[in-house]
Design a protein with these regions (language model features):
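Catalytic core regions of nucleotide second-messenger enzymes
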Residues: 62, 91-109
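Residue-level recognition of strand-loop junctions within catalytic nucleotide-signaling folds
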Residues: 32, 72-75, 92, 116-117
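Conserved long alpha-helical elements within nucleotide-processing catalytic cores of c-di-GMP signaling
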Residues: 1-19, 25-52, 61-65, 69-70, ...
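A structural signal for short, well-ordered beta-strand segments
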Residues: 22, 68, 109-113
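Catalytic-core segments of nucleotide cyclases and related cyclic-nucleotide turnover enzymes
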Residues: 81-84, 114-150
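Signal-transduction coiled-coil helices of two-component systems
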Residues: 6, 91-94, 136
Length: 150
């Protein structure tokens, strides 16, 4: 996969890969209030904004329900925090205008950020990012949290 290739290249170059795990805050409420078609539009708009605020070599994938996972090759933890904050601010500033209605939907993101140096550590880095994501949610949502080991 492209992710494995990216991780292997960074491992050979001994460069870190940042892992951003994010969740759309209160997404169930969007679906419950506006319906799943609007929820799908929110997911698509969020992915587009995230991609627009990432570099050409960065990878973005939907990780499940309303979660996204981004791999940022050759990115230090501090640069990853800056990237996540930039994405968070861009999504927060965006208003989705639902086609054929006057409905406007705004969402925010919570992030967990970790770093990985080799392919073998990817699952552990994902678990650390997930813990940091939950810390973001526990501390009020709409924020970026760096995993403790970083």
């Amino acid at each position: 996969s492209q992710a494995q290739h990216t991780l292997a290249a960074c491992e050979r170059a001994q460069e870190p890969v940042a892992l951003l795990l994010c969740d759309i805050d209160h997404f169930k409420q969007v679906n419950d209030t506006h319906g799943h078609a609007v929820g799908d539009q929110v997911l698509q708009a969020t992915a587009k904004i995230m991609t627009q605020n990432m570099r050409a070599g960065d990878l973005l994938a939907r990780w499940g329900g309303e979660e996204f996972l981004a791999l940022l090759p050759s990115t230090s933890p501090s640069a990853a925090l800056e990237a996540a904050e930039r994405i968070r601010e861009a999504v927060e500033a965006f208003t989705l205008r639902v086609s054929d209605t006057n409905t406007q939907v705004r969402v925010t993101l919570s992030f967990g950020v970790s770093s990985v140096r080799c392919l073998d550590d990817l699952l552990a880095a994902t678990a650390r990012a997930d813990q940091a994501l939950y810390a973001s949610k526990d501390n009020g949502r709409n924020r970026v949290t760096l995993a403790e080991d970083q």
